[in-house]
């Protein structure tokens, strides 16, 4: 199995995750989208030195993965390429902010180290929450929720078509890669001299597939907007869940819960 086929399999695995049945899957897409967006906005709003406040925000995705019965390591495996890039964003902070803001015993910790860790946690937690939404909600349900929020139909259609056509593009790339390997069995990968013709052929093949797909969509009544069918019945607990989560998220932002809990047991 070449890399294009592996990517296609992983992409289709997201649809399989979204098709599972759990209390989290049965919540309405709009409520999950609302909570996820609120969680991301609140998480990134923490001060760069508020590491204890940011750390509390890990509870939402962790509880969400437990309720949805999706292992947490699945998230880290799927996002194994993106997470190191997110963590790398704050690597230079210790070199620019060298002021000591915390002492652990006799060892001083600079503000750059604190802000680096805070930024890393923000990125990881937001990715975990976003993956939780994608793993428990199909792309059709996400787009339907966006339309309920009056997001322009052009954007929702573009999002849905892009997501669906990526799988088609990967299939075409896998076919071409296999054909190239049959013609050059002893060669590892595509030689640099063939990159131009390979990409050009991939472009032509993808344009042909796109034309065929669009014509078939028009034959089925597509006129610039998708009419989303009602998915699985939503749980009655959808909006109580959303309101409860929103209240807890805002509470965690307004009050430093670790400090409050520490004061109770001091």
Please give the residue ranges for each predicted region.
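Hydrophobic/aromatic residues in well-formed alpha-helices
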Residues: 75, 142, 239-240
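Juxtamembrane/interface alpha-helical elements of multi-pass membrane proteins
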Residues: 78-185
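Membrane-helix interfacial "entry" motifs
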Residues: 21, 25, 69-74, 103, ...
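Membrane-helix interface segments
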Residues: 50, 71-72, 152-155
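Interfacial helix-loop-helix linkers and transmembrane-helix boundary segments
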Residues: 53, 71-79
């Amino acid at each position: 199995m070449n890399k294009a086929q592996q990517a296609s399999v992983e992409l289709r695995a997201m649809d399989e995750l979204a098709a599972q049945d759990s209390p989290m899957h049965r919540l309405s897409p709009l409520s999950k989208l609302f909570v996820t967006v609120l969680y991301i906005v609140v998480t990134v709003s923490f001060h760069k030195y508020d590491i204890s406040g940011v750390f509390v925000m890990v509870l939402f995705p962790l509880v969400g993965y437990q309720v949805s019965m999706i292992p947490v390591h699945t998230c880290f495996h799927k996002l194994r390429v993106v997470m190191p890039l997110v963590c790398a964003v704050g690597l230079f902070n210790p070199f620019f902010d060298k002021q000591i803001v915390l002492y652990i015993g006799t060892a001083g910790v600079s503000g750059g180290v604190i802000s680096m860790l805070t930024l890393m946690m923000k990125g990881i937690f937001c990715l975990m929450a976003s993956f939780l939404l994608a793993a428990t909600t199909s792309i059709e349900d996400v787009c339907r929720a966006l339309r309920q929020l009056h997001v322009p139909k052009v954007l929702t259609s573009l999002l849905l078509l892009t997501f669906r056509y990526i799988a088609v593009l990967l299939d075409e790339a896998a076919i071409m890669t296999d054909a190239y390997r049959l013609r050059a069995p002893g060669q590892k990968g595509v030689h640099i001299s063939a990159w131009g013709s390979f990409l050009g052929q991939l472009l032509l093949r993808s344009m042909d597939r796109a034309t065929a797909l669009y014509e078939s969509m028009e034959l089925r009544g597509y006129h610039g907007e998708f009419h989303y069918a009602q998915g699985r019945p939503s749980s009655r607990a959808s909006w109580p869940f959303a309101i409860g989560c929103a209240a807890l998220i805002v509470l965690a932002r307004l009050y430093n819960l670790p400090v409050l809990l520490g004061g109770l047991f001091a």
